[in-house]
Design a protein with these regions (language model features):
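A surface-exposed partner-binding patch
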Residues: 1-100, 141-143
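Long, low-complexity acidic/proline-rich regions
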Residues: 108-109, 120
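Short, flexible beta-strand-to-coil junctions
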Residues: 91-95, 104-105, 115-117
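A short, sequence-level motif marking secondary-structure junctions
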Residues: 104-107, 127-129
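Short conserved micro-motifs at the rims of enzyme active sites and ligand-binding pockets
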Residues: 100-103, 122-124
Length: 143
């Protein structure tokens, strides 16, 4: 479903081989958070998605672990920013901001995080909407 949806919206998208169940379980183990259902579902079909310019719209399972743990452990980040422990960063824009899942009272939501201000703003509530905005509206859609 995800591969077809992505290629329908953005034929130039670069899709990877799927992530396996062992890999997804390792992501949850390392991050100590469950993967949102729709993100896990996408990763089961393609382990990451890039646009034609190489921007990682959705990170691979490996990058999910590496980047999230690095952000949580970076001493400077611990002083400068509110904690990231309840967030799962999963994508970025060539303009600097990164996107993360957070849990809201209504379920998971996707926020954009601005590293300059530590502002975290809910931008969409579904991965489908996030992908549509990234691929159809371009890199500045979240502004």
């Amino acid at each position: 479903m995800w591969r077809e949806l992505i290629l329908q919206m953005y034929p130039e998208a670069d899709l990877n081989d799927p992530a396996d169940e062992v890999t997804l379980a390792e992501v949850e183990k390392h991050l100590m958070l469950p993967l949102p259902f729709e993100l896990a579902s996408l990763l089961r079909e393609t382990d990451g998605v890039s646009n034609e310019y190489g921007d990682a719209v959705v990170w691979s399972a490996r990058r999910l672990v590496e980047d999230n743990l690095a952000m949580r452990r970076e001493p400077d980040y611990l002083e400068l920013y509110a904690p990231f422990d309840e967030m799962i960063f999963f994508g970025d824009s060539d303009m600097g901001p990164q996107f993360a899942y957070v849990h809201t009272d209504y379920g998971p939501g996707i926020v954009v995080w601005d590293h300059e201000s530590d502002r975290r703003r809910l931008v969409v509530v579904s991965l489908r909407d996030y992908l549509a905005r990234c691929f159809i509206q371009g890199n500045a859609w979240f502004r």
